[in-house]
């Protein structure tokens, strides 16, 4: 048995070395036939001994389907990078670095060296983190996730032949890299694929987030490594030293690494990378510039999101030319009428683009966009389609885009306000009315259960509902005439509408649909002014005293309650029995009074609504997102990304038991 194990270890070491020579160095020392013979010998020995070494090349073969992804907490954080879109922004970043270094050197005897940068390509794939233990064995691979917690993709990463399963290292490290799909692998995969892939990035991301390991293996991914994020061994003094370590460990690394001492050199390297972008066998979307000296990095430090010693230079988004066929005008809940470009379908970055946003008529005129013209379409940040301009030669046979003077839905005359057009027919314009009703009935507003957009459309079309107040005039017999409304459903909706009449004032304010006013602002208004009458009669000067209310929001609120139609509708709601209330309770001193609290996960003793009410009764502000202004994050079972964000920002985290003890 011992002899067989020794032979297995010998074969594994040999085969891994041959794989490194073949896939990473592109310089094989044995033939494919010789490799296959040794591989087959190893497979036979593994079957006989029923032992498989964790770094055996046979572990690369995907032959199973996993049940689910598990979470993995990174030992070292995977930071995002700040971005520069042009050289001016890059120079500003450089000057900030210079200033910090000059200040440090003026006060310290231990001087920092002259700034030196390392420039590399920015790969457009999926960031991965590989953990090697003290024996050099790959024990875990994970996605970046939040930067603190990712998803375990160890089995998927093992299908990447360039990633070593064992390295010659005797301390725990985490190595960061980018998993990519080459153009060659992409084309080969699509030749036989029933559903062809549209782009390289999705090909890589989809492979690593696929529970079918065979499918992952079929995509034949590659990887480049560029950072040691966690290291229990000797510290590195420079990024160059770190990159040499990565290379010496046999991890695949891009050959392009350039050292620069000033911004002129950096700019030349960026121009070079962009010039070869189309020639590469993989996608890149920019360049990465990092400070070489590790001590200088430590002095420069970090923001909440980014290291200050590194930045990504983003290339211009990909553009393509297509024809503008038409412009569609849509009406929102506020009555604003906005244009959308309808395009001749075109492939851009692996996505079929048919529509693009045109912000307003000023934007259309500024870009000289015309019907029938060839337009330049860009997917900003490779995601959102945007018209950047026109091909001048195509304008001869084009037509001017005319701003509508009537609403495309109700034919009412439009009113221009600034750069936007508005339909003021709030009562009879279907899109406005339907969206307003849906908003009014939503859970955060009047909480009318069983209400949907389809129901709102039927109420508008069949029952002639032309105002929010009309909801409270509906009769059960009328609902029975609607599609899919039987006796029980009709009665349930009538009951839900009637039950909504007794509502808290903050929900009522939110339900009114005041522009720029969300639920939090509605709560803040009520806390400040106490009554509906006070809110209606407040001034802009008083409104800006409310937390997080600036002049724009204050003017929106003020103008809203100056509208006679709106005041009339509110009066009608009150006359129909809607009774918004506000109960100001005397709150005893407690640890949560005046604190901002975020809740995440499932609690044993409270529903989400109950814990929100409980916290507010304690005088706390309940927020939906974690920020540096958050005082506590209350964590239940199966917490989400808010918990991770709290850890990242150093926000105090408490569980349900701790919460209960604090309020006893």
Swiss-Prot record:
Domain BRCT: 587-664
Sites where the protein binds NAD(+): 32-36, 80-81, 144, 178, 314
Keyword presence, Aminoacyl-tRNA synthetase: no
S-adenosyl-L-methionine listed as a keyword: no
Record SUPFAM superfamilies: BRCT domain, DNA ligase/mRNA capping enzyme, catalytic domain, Nucleic acid-binding proteins, RuvA domain 2-like
SMART domains according to UniProt: BRCT, HhH1, LIGANc
A single Gene Ontology CC term: cytosol
Residues binding Zn(2+), per UniProt: 407, 410, 423, 429
Known EC number: 6.5.1.2
GO molecular function: DNA binding; DNA ligase (NAD+) activity; metal ion binding
Record's keyword terms, sorted: DNA damage, DNA repair, DNA replication, Ligase, Magnesium, Manganese, Metal-binding, NAD, Zinc
Cofactor: Mg(2+); Mn(2+)
GO BP field: DNA repair; DNA replication
InterPro entries: BRCT_dom, BRCT_dom_sf, DisA/LigA_HHH, DNA_ligase, DNA_ligase_CS, DNAligase_adenylation, DNAligase_N, Hlx-hairpin-Hlx_DNA-bd_motif
Any Pfam family matching the protein: HHH_5
Job description of the protein: DNA ligase that catalyzes the formation of phosphodiester linkages between 5'-phosphoryl and 3'-hydroxyl groups in double-stranded DNA using NAD as a coenzyme and as the energy source for the reaction. It is essential for DNA replication and repair of damaged DNA.
Record's protein name: DNA ligase
Native source species: Clostridium botulinum (strain Kyoto / Type A2)
Name of the gene this protein is made from: ligA
């Amino acid at each position: 048995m011992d002899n067989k194990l020794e032979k297995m270890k010998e074969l594994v070491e040999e085969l891994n070395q041959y794989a490194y020579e073949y896939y990473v160095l592109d310089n094989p020392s044995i033939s494919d036939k010789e490799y296959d013979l040794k591989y087959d010998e190893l497979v036979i020995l593994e079957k006989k001994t029923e032992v498989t070494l964790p770094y055996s090349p046979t572990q690369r073969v995907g032959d199973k389907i996993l049940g689910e992804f598990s979470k993995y907490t990174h030992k070292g954080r995977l930071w995002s990078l700040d971005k520069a879109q042009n050289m001016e922004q890059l120079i500003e970043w450089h000057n900030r670095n210079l200033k910090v270094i000059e200040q440090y050197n003026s006060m310290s005897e231990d001087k920092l060296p002259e700034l030196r940068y390392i420039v590399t390509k920015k790969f457009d794939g999926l960031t991965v983190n590989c953990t090697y233990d003290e024996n050099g064995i790959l024990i875990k691979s994970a996605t970046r996730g939040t930067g603190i917690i990712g998803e375990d993709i160890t089995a998927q990463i093992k299908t990447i032949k360039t990633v070593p399963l064992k390295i010659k290292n005797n301390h725990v490290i985490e190595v960061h890299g980018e998993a990519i799909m080459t153009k060659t692998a992409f084309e080969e995969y699509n030749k036989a694929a029933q559903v062809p892939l549209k782009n390289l990035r999705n090909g890589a991301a989809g492979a690593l987030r696929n529970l079918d390991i065979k499918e992952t293996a079929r995509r034949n991914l590659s990887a480049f490594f560029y950072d040691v994020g966690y290291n229990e061994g000797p510290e590195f003094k420079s990024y160059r030293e770190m990159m040499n370590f990565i290379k010496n460990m046999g991890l695949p690394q891009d050959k392009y690494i350039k050292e620069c001492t000033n911004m002129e050199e950096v700019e030349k390297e960026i121009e070079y990378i962009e010039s070869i972008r189309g020639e590469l066998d993989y996608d890149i979307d920019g360049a990465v510039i990092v400070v070489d000296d590790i001590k200088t990095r430590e002095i420069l430090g970090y923001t909440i999101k980014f290291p200050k010693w590194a930045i990504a230079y983003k290339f211009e988004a990909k553009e393509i030319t297509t024809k503008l066929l038409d412009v569609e005008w849509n009406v929102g809940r506020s009555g604003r009428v906005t244009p959308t470009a309808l395009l001749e379908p075109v492939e851009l970055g692996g996505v079929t683009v048919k529509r693009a946003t045109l912000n307003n008529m000023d934007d259309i005129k500024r870009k000289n966009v015309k019907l029938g013209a060839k337009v330049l379409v860009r997917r900003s940040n490779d995601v959102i389609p945007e018209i950047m301009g026109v091909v001048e030669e195509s304008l001869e046979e084009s037509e001017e885009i005319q701003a509508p003077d009537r609403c495309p839905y109700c034919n009412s005359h439009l009113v221009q306000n600034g750069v936007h057009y508005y339909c003021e027919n709030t009562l009879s314009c279907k899109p406005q009315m339907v969206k307003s009703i849906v908003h009014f009935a939503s859970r955060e507003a009047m909480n009318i259960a069983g209400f949907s957009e389809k129901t709102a459309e039927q109420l508008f079309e069949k029952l002639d509902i032309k105002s929010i107040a009309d909801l409270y005039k509906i009769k059960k017999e009328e609902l029975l005439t609607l599609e899919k409304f039987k006796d029980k459903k009709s009665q349930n909706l009538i009951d839900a509408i009637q039950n909504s009449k007794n509502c808290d004032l903050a929900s009522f304010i939110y339900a009114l649909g005041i522009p720029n006013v969300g639920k939090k602002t509605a709560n803040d208004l009520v806390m400040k002014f106490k009554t509906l009458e006070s809110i209606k009669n407040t001034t802009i000067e008083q409104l800006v005293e409310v937390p997080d209310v600036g002049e724009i929001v204050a003017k929106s609120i003020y103008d809203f309650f100056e509208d006679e139609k709106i005041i009339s509708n509110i009066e009608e709601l009150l006359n129909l029995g809607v009774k918004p209330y506000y109960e100001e309770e005397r709150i005893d001193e407690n640890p949560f009074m005046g604190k901002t609290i975020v809740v995440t996960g499932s609690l044993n003793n409270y529903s989400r609504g109950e814990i929100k009410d409980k916290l507010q009764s304690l005088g706390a502000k309940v927020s939906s997102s974690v920020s540096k202004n958050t005082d506590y994050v209350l964590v239940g079972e199966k917490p989400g990304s808010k918990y991770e964000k709290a850890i990242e920002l150093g926000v105090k985290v408490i569980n349900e038991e701790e919460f209960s003890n604090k309020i006893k």
